[in-house]
Amino acid sequence: MAKKIAGQLKLQVSAGSATPSPPIGPALGQRGINIMEFCKAFNAQTQEMEKGSPVPVVITYYQDKSFTFVMKTPPVSYFLKKAANLKSGSKEPGKVKAGTVSRDKVREIATAKMKDLNANDVEAAMRMVEGSARSMGLEVVG
């Protein structure tokens, strides 16, 4: 018989640096999930990733207090800021440009995010990434 799902929890955790301190510890603890077990498993799986990159993770926890988790790719905004060498996007995206991103970089980001985006092909994924770039005040050139 399959385990009964008690719920799901979505977090964004820095790759390779999951610790029992807030916000991870309290979020997991109040649901009865073993915090150290999650931290060890998450850090082991994110060893190969760039340290400090934000990784969205969906944790499914069961009534017997066990859990499974699925990691997604870092957010598009993270990739765009990295490609444009920015700390943050524009404060006024429609008026003030924060920087530029080449179409090749957009294609690279779209290819990396393809499995997490709701797109059928790379061109559709590129349009989604370009929309994110515009909303951050970045100009797509090339």
From Swiss-Prot:
Pfam (any one): Ribosomal_L11_N
| GO molecular function, a single term | structural constituent of ribosome
Q: Which UniProt keywords apply?
A: Methylation, Ribonucleoprotein, Ribosomal protein, RNA-binding, rRNA-binding
Output the superkingdom of the source species.
Bacteria
PTM comment text: One or more lysine residues are methylated.
Of the GO CC terms on this record, one is: cytosolic large ribosomal subunit
Q: Which biological process terms from the Gene Ontology are attached to this UniProt entry?
A: translation
Which InterPro entries does the UniProt entry name for this protein? Answer: Ribosomal_uL11, Ribosomal_uL11_bac-typ, Ribosomal_uL11_C, Ribosomal_uL11_C_sf, Ribosomal_uL11_CS, Ribosomal_uL11_N, Ribosomal_uL11_N_sf
- In the UniProt record, does the keyword Iron occur? no
What is the similarity comment for this entry? Belongs to the universal ribosomal protein uL11 family.
Write out the function statement from the record.
Answer: Forms part of the ribosomal stalk which helps the ribosome interact with GTP-bound translation factors.
Name this polypeptide is given: Large ribosomal subunit protein uL11
| Source organism per UniProt | Mesorhizobium japonicum (strain LMG 29417 / CECT 9101 / MAFF 303099) (Mesorhizobium loti (strain MAFF 303099))
